[in-house]
Amino acid sequence: MISGVSLLRGRLLVFCAIAMSALVLRLAVTSFSPLAAQISEEIGFSSTVVGVFGMIPTAMFAAFGLATPALGRRWGLERTALIAMLMAGVGMATRALMTDTWSLLLLSGLALGGMGIGNVVIPPLVKRYFSDTLALVSSVYIVGVQLSTIVPAFVAVPLADAFGWRVSLGVWALVGFAAAVPWVWVLLRHRNADAGEVAPVDRNVDGRVWRSPVGWGMAGMFGMTSLVTYSMFTWIPDILADAGASPAFGGAMVGLFALLGLVSAFGAPSLCARMTNPFPVVVACASCFLIAFAGLWIAPMSAPILWIVLLGLGPSTFPMALTLINLRSRSHAGSAALSGFTQGVGYTVACLGPLLFGVFHDLTSGWTASFAFMTVAVAVLVTGAYQACKPRVVEDSWNSRPISVG
């Protein structure tokens, strides 16, 4: 029998493990992008390869996202989280030592694969240990993810200037290895308490998500949010430069866009958890997107900060989607299946966003078609969110027995 104090300590340990893991989940992406030109000069790869590096994150997130629920059933959620952090740490450490393009690509894929597993396994862990404080722990987790996006982007170049690009690229491995430590401790405590085994679950659960309107709604909401967000991260500087802005101003607007994502991570999960059906919030976010698109298309330099602020409020649907993974599932097994499906399908679609945005621009020599593409994506987002936000759980929807959860 585990005492109340022991249980509290165990939850605190898992909380620390989740928070530290969240700080790892984007490091391999934003620590590389600012250094791509320096690395290319030394190793010698083309701009096409830089584009390949740009597509690897979402591709790995998609592939490993779809595989993670099965891994979680085989190894257990905690062990899967440990493996994810070790993959991320090893990948980030070793890729910084490579001298050829293919090794750099392969080991970047290893790091990003670990992060893809982490993306999917953390929500069901939150569900398993913190079902009574979902909004709070979800906020902590999502803020950690946003920090892992923002911090490397700001410090990668100064670190490279001071110590070289290899140190700047590899130092983030320390965060990955540090995040693995509390998971080792969690597993040891479980073994000592004879509580390390995962309860048996229906192994057909993943396939059932494919038949669920909740699953497809979540995938549409998450995927289109990610597609628009990645597209804007990539193209904001070019859109503003085409209107006469300086590169420095374009970079500052990208930073503002990222910062607003951090702000929304604080409030969106709790707002989502307090509402039986948070669809009106999604409509408000979609409206922000559409107004920003119109402004950036028609008169980008008339009020650029306003357009970017509105654009930055739109992706509040990202932390909402991550929170809904747990709010729209009954068990941690259902959460794992929904998380894998949502992020696997979502990132598969999202990886096409920046590419197609650029293709439409090149084909038309303007931004009209590109912003029309973004508008269609927002329409799909709203359609998916309508299904995702309904007060029901995925386990009931795949059995065609909808039951209210609030």
State where each predicted segment sits.
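Extracytoplasmic
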Residues: 13-47, 65-68, 232-237, 353
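Extracytoplasmic gate region of multi-pass secondary transporters
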Residues: 32-33, 213-265
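Helix-breaking motifs and short loop linkers at transmembrane-helix boundaries and internal kinks
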Residues: 44, 76, 97-102, 131, ...
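Conserved MFS/SLC helix-loop-helix module at the cytosolic interface between two early adjacent transmembrane helices
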Residues: 63-102
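Cytoplasmic helix-loop-helix junction between adjacent transmembrane helices
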Residues: 107-144
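Helix-loop-helix hairpin linking two adjacent transmembrane segments in secondary transporters
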Residues: 132-133, 140-188
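C-terminal transmembrane helical hairpin of 12-TM major facilitator-type secondary transporters
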Residues: 276-321
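A late C-terminal transmembrane helix in Major Facilitator Superfamily
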Residues: 329-367, 374
